[in-house]
Amino acid sequence: ICTGDGLSLAMQAGVPLMDTEMIQYHPTTLAGNGILLSEAARGDGAYLINSEGERFMEKYAPEYMELASRDVVSRAEQTEIDEGRGVDGCVFLDLRHLGKKFIEDRLGYLQEVALEFRGIDLSEKPIPIKPGMHYIMGGIKTDLNGATNVPGLYAAGECANVSVHGANRPVSYTHLRAHET
């Protein structure tokens, strides 16, 4: 969950921030609490449906459907919600067609989260999701060694701006951050 605490602390100390206008939204956060639901569900064949039961990604990314990039999927979900095809500010992640055994074997974590936080068995009912703020592409301005303009104050990891990802960080690129310096 992106809270921005590191950026706030740095800014209060007089450290400049860079490229904070570039924000990535994750397309599958759990309605109500924002828990991030793994994209493995979509990778394993889950559908995104609206309040009408329509697999809406065909309108937005017909070649990729649910496997489109995070920004495309997040915008599509928000469009469906804004145009009245959502329910309570959400669309749905539908795994019912995958079957109970597949869900338990391949997506057990998702099943546990759905049961614990929404009381939903994913093999029986779609789960409400919405785009949620996930990652800020920019961050605390540093040099190549992670030093800021405040002597002795360093920033590293996801709070630091290292200008690697541009406007849209692909899935699993967090690992790239370990190889940046």
Question: Where are the regions that the model predicts?
Answer:
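Glycine-rich beta-alpha-beta "Rossmann" dinucleotide-binding loop(s) and their flanking helix/strand
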Residues: 1
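Short amphipathic alpha-helical face segments that pack within enzyme cores
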Residues: 4-12, 177
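Acidic active-site catalytic centers that drive phospho-/nucleotidyl reactions
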Residues: 5, 19, 50, 143, ...
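An anion/pyrophosphate-binding glycine-rich loop and adjacent beta-alpha core
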Residues: 9, 15-121, 172
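Glycine-rich phosphate/pyrophosphate-binding beta-alpha loops
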Residues: 26-28, 160-173
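Short secondary-structure transition/capping segments
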Residues: 29-34, 135-136, 167
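A glycine-rich dinucleotide-binding beta-alpha-beta segment and adjacent secondary-structure elements
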Residues: 106-163
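Conserved small/polar residues in nucleotide/adenosyl-binding loops
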Residues: 174-181
